[in-house]
Amino acid sequence: SRAEQSRALIKLLQYVYGYVRIPLGDIGSICMCKRILKSQTNTVSGVPFYKIGTFGKEADAYISQETFDEYRSRYNFPKKGDVLISAAGTIGRTVVYNGEPAYFQDSNIVWIDNDESIVLNSYLRFCYELKPWKASEGGTIPRLYNDNIAKAVIAIPSIEEQKRIVSILDRFDTICNDLTSGLPAEIEARQKQYEYYRDKLLSFKEHKDELYD
């Protein structure tokens, strides 16, 4: 199949060059949940419904268990470990879906249904921190369209190298989070150090020729 041929080509280029640069649209479909109407929500109880304003925070709206079960089975829904992306407001914020019952606002919160034999979700999360896309400016709210995400190019090394990079960045991440009670200057210095190594690890040397079309 075309997908199998694509995976084989990617792995060949990774073997030859160490990594391959490909657009996010080539590693999986960009997905979103089915639209939830305001009339389907309440502010008291049920399955948490996250809107762009509560993404990564506490939900202030809920949907019924029945609606959740129906929509999860009939329409797009993230898998545990998928990296959700904010497509409006503060562009590019990420939340790793933990598998707990929750529903997410359509179009404003999206994810890539990627093949983890090519790129790990944990690696993707760090790539998203670099914000490889270009947000469209229009109206009062900056908007990240599916096309912006699909055309964004990232460097993907072998799975083994992805795991190594993730392990290093996870350790830096933990150190930075453990410093929340430290001196502001120390916290800032650690954060800059983390960003420096993250950028170095995720920015591979470019080749003159295109590695992937």
Predicted regions and their residues:
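Sequence-specific dsDNA recognition surfaces
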Residues: 25-39, 53-80
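Non-catalytic DNA-recognition/assembly elements of restriction-modification systems
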Residues: 11-34, 186-197
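Short amphipathic alpha-helical linker/capping segments at the junctions of internal repeats
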Residues: 102-103, 173-174, 183-199
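A short beta-sheet element
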Residues: 51, 73-129
